[in-house]
Amino acid sequence: MMSSSSSEIDVVKTRIPTYDEDDNTVLYAYETKPEFVNKELNIVSDASCNTEEQQKTVNDVLIHCQVIYDAMQNLDKKIDVIRRKVSKIQRFCVKSLWTNRKRYGYKKYSYRLAKKLKLKKMKKNEVYESFSYPESYSPTLPVSRCENNSPSNFPRPSFCMEEYRRAEPEEDPILSRTPSPVHPSDFSEHNYQPYYASDGATYGSSSGTCRGNPRADGIHNTYSTDHASAAPPSVTGSLFGNDCYIEEGSITKHPSTWSVEAVVLFLKQTDPLALCPLVDLFRSHEIDGKALLLLTSDVLLKHLGVKLGTAVKLCYYIDRLKQGKCFEN
């Protein structure tokens, strides 16, 4: 009979009988126990289940890591975009700063320039306010200034009326026969010297000669509207270097009604040094008040041969006459 014996726990050892009696060889057959086979299958199945679970867990972890990596990549991209925008803003600010930057000392320079212009304007206004009517416009023809009794320090933006002051010259053999006192003329802008007429002079004429009074040339007088309206025209004259008299009645209220001698008187009293050389010229051309108001610089320069400085000054005085509002009709 076959005898079976187990040498191991999971293996069944069975002796196989031989038919040769002389041979001492012993044969055994080994078989695995069924229980062990079932147990091994269970172990393998459990191991496979555990492996699948681990693989699933690993896959989940890898998926989460990939998500985190993608999020970090997106953050890096956004950070790069923000950095580029910030750098662009910084470059724009620096560029605008350098473009609109004022030069060194620009503020101080502009302040000085504005102050300089303001001072220049103030000086110009002061010069205009302190403008004296007999002002020279020619560098070769200076104008004498009145120092003591001339009211030239007052501002004259327009024609002004000042009180007429009578002069009291020394007695002269020729002038002592003048019966009437000095009366103001109707011309209100310029400073006239007092003048006297001889007995031979009549109203409306400029005839009569006399010798000049040296003290009468330095006296400058103006008059007010009250004196002008109250004083009747009298037979008085003005004393000049050509030893002739001009009656006061020939100088009327408006320049357009002046006679030739009244225009000559205007030239001599306005600016003696600059305009006295034009006396003979005006007399030769018989320029009266209307012609005086129509004179221009071109006519003076081209047709009358007057120098530029003298023409400029005369045109200025004529413009002052045209703009005057003190003449009453």
From Swiss-Prot:
Function, as annotated: Putative Polycomb group (PcG) protein. PcG proteins act by forming multiprotein complexes, which are required to maintain the transcriptionally repressive state of homeotic genes throughout development. May be involved in spermatogenesis during sexual maturation.
Keyword entries, A-Z: Nucleus, Phosphoprotein, Repressor, Transcription, Transcription regulation
Protein name in UniProt: Sex comb on midleg-like protein 1
CDD domains: SAM_Scm (cd09578)
Domain SAM: 258-325
Gene: SCML1
Phosphoserine PTM sites in chain numbering: 138, 238
GO cellular component, one term: nucleus
Family as reported in the entry's similarity comment: Belongs to the SCM family.
Phosphoprotein among keywords: yes
InterPro entries documented for this protein: SAM, SAM/pointed_sf, SAM_Scm-like
A Pfam family reported for this protein in Swiss-Prot or TrEMBL: SAM_1
Record localization: Nucleus
